[in-house]
From Swiss-Prot:
GO MF annotations in UniProt: TIR domain binding; Toll-like receptor binding; transcription factor binding
Keywords recorded for this protein, A-Z: Cytoplasm, Immunity, Inflammatory response, Innate immunity
Intracellular or extracellular location(s): Cytoplasm
Domain notes: The intermediate domain (ID) is required for the phosphorylation and activation of IRAK.
Domain of life: Eukaryota
Role summary: Adapter protein involved in the Toll-like receptor and IL-1 receptor signaling pathway in the innate immune response.
TIR domain residues: 146-280
Protein name as it appears in the record: Myeloid differentiation primary response protein MyD88
Entries under Pfam families matching the protein: Death, TIR_2
Amino acid sequence: MSTSLDLWNIPLRALNINVRKRLGLFLNPRNTVASDWMSVAENMGFSYLEIKNYEDCLDPTRRILEDWQARCPGAKVGKLLSILDNVDRKDVVEDLRDLIEEDCRRYIERQNEPPLQVPEVDSCVPKTQERQGITLEDDPEGGIPELFDAFICYCQSDFDFVHEMXQQLEQTDHKLKLCVFDRDVLPGSCVWTITSELIEKRCKRMVVVISDEYLDSDACDFQTKFALSLCPGARSKRLIPVKYRSMKKPFPSILRFLTVCDYTRPCTQSWFWVRLARALSLP
């Protein structure tokens, strides 16, 4: 690699789709001679059970890259190359050398570009019409946007529990303000744009309601990975998983490093809402 690039300080998100697809071409096929994606995942810190769960993925290399990037603050390009070297896949590094360098250079160039707004402008206030007037209490003139204590990530099948959550946290002495998409967001806008705006700019934290249906939801998958990318390593305690009923499927591996608020344990149910409210009330 070029000596002008400090790859140990460039995050994994600098690598674009083309490089990730080519990594999959090298690592996805099971190989009795050369190390494959399983060896890479093990060196990334994934457990045996987590790696076994990835076996069902069509592109396990893509999944481990995404999940490693979301859960590990040390997920840098340099670290990935070091892992490939440790598992004796120097052939992969050599073949993708130019593409990786190009992606990293483009990433640095984007980072060095001047911001679109001048310093005097508060970047917390949305400036495009698409990000104005997206919730019930938003100022239609584009003034101060409506803010929330937490964004609730949930599936439609879990809406009864979300309704109870709103009663327990909003209509009691806790007086928290939750962002429930079906209740608070106005129709007619791009779902992905609005969701990212709410999670990043409008909500201090995100509560993830875990269930079997959650694991099959593309929307929940996007929301969770987006929130994790904003706080790698959970340094800001931004994301709080909640389990309120028993599951047949394995708990999502991407959230296993976070403390869970578990409603399924009868012995702790009386403390459940107080603990959740306190976590959402932190600065």
